[in-house]
From Swiss-Prot:
Functional description taken from the UniProt entry: Has strong antifungal activity against C.albicans MDM8, C.krusei IOC 4559 (MIC=2.5-5 uM), C.glabrata IOC 45658 (MIC=2.5-5 uM), C.albicans IOC 45588 (MIC=2.5-5 uM), C.parapsilosis IOC 456416 (MIC=2.5-5 uM), C.tropicalis IOC 45608 (MIC=2.5-5 uM), C.guilliermondii IOC 455716 (MIC=2.5-5 uM) and A.niger (MIC=5-10 uM). Lacks antifungal activity against B.bassiana. Has no antibacterial effect against Gram-positive bacteria M.luteus, S.epidermidis, S.aureus or against Gram-negative bacteria E.coli and P.aeruginosa. Has no hemolytic activity against human erythrocytes. Probable ion channel inhibitor.
Keywords in alphabetical order: Antimicrobial, Disulfide bond, Fungicide, Ion channel impairing toxin, Knottin, Secreted, Toxin
Highest classification ranks of the organism: Eukaryota, Metazoa, Ecdysozoa, Arthropoda, Chelicerata
This protein's name: U-theraphotoxin-Aju1a
Covalent S-S links between cysteines: 3-24, 7-30, 16-35
Species of provenance: Avicularia juruensis
Domain comment (free text): The presence of a 'disulfide through disulfide knot' structurally defines this protein as a knottin.
Compartments (UniProt record): Secreted
Length: 38
């Protein structure tokens, strides 16, 4: 899943994606600069 913009928000102490990257992993996606569970 590719994010439109980079978001480095952490959820439960774990980043939903790498810093500066636009690709989310681990069942998360970026939406409006926040991590949301897919």
């Amino acid at each position: 899943f590719t994010c439109a913009i980079s978001c480095d928000i952490k959820v439960n102490g774990k980043p939903c994606k790498g810093s500066g990257e636009k690709k989310c992993s681990g069942g998360w996606s970026c939406k409006f600069n926040v991590c949301v569970k897919v």
